[in-house]
Amino acid sequence: MKFNKLFASLVAVSLSIINIHVSAKTILLVPQDNRPVSLAYTVSTAEKAGYTVLTPPEQYLSTNHHQGLPELIWSWIDNNIEKADAAVISTDTLIYGGLVDSRKHTDSIDKLMYREKRIQQLHEKFPQKPIYAFGTIMRTPYASNTGVEPYYYTKYGPTIYHIAVLQDKLDKVGLTPNEEKQLTQLKASIPTEYLQDWFNRREKNNAITQNLIKYTKDNIFTYFCLGLDDSTVYSQSAMEARYLKNDFKNLSENKLGAFPGADQLALLLIARYHVDDNQLSPTFNIIYPLGRGEDTIPSYESQPVGKTIAQHITAVGGTININTPDIVLAANTPLFTTKESGQFANFKMSKPSTKEFVASIK
């Protein structure tokens, strides 16, 4: 996703510009899968900032083609945690196996809670080691034929998506008579067992997330970040996030953040550890090109990009200061709307609007 790269750039810049001498600190990192954005890019950025990064063997991690191995990853943690000064962990990996596994698993709630309990036990055994954790609210995609959703999503994904949109709208503002009729027809058009499977998995995942929020309240996590993976204004993901906010409404934003994104979260938490450990208070100013700027709502997200950037700055331990910032973040938002990554408008080329924006930065 284009804007996930933007936020990854934000935290990478945070590490590089506010970097002071790092005295060979070691971070134990459990990524959400083995993709470069989750593993290689994150490790490389942290190492360039002076950190040693420990990661599980790649064959233990989730991919698009096979499940992650949480039991083996937990054994690896047990054998390596004493070498680390801090831990940055994907709860999706430790509980479900990985990001994709969180959408497809068939594990019982008892098994999931057993794995989740091990996080608490890790903190109890090593209370002096800060744990920075990140998880996701399961996404609600319009369609998927890449094997990263349950098998029935290839055929029924758009139907499930529209059911979720209408149910969220019903819960939030209500439906018109025509929309109520449409919702009934959509539910009747899909085998009941598929809907039950999808919603039952979400119910289990939601219960796990509620416990993770409790762990944050109990100071098991130094900081917990909850990402909304590929969401829209109306969706099952947006509705779950709305209700989960009641569970953490009394928590400081310096303890828990919830906002769109998934791929950038590990790097964000490494930057947060860097800020905490060095007792820094970085300040930012954000500038935008012509167009909707901060009011742009990216595809697959449920809120304006300006709000999301501000939440990322808070999550990394920074504040906005337009007068004397440590960092000026230039967010290259589109003139109108965001495009799909494969569309011609997103090909790498020198565009007049981009040239003008870069010139204004200089």
Can you say where each PLM-predicted feature lies in the sequence?
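Bacterial N-terminal signal peptides that target proteins for export
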Residues: 1-10
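A ubiquitous, low-specificity "background" feature that marks scattered single residues
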Residues: 10-11, 332
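Sec-dependent N-terminal signal peptides of Gram-positive bacterial secreted proteins and lipoproteins
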Residues: 15-16
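An N-terminal assembly and electron-transfer interface module characteristic of large anaerobic redox
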Residues: 25-362
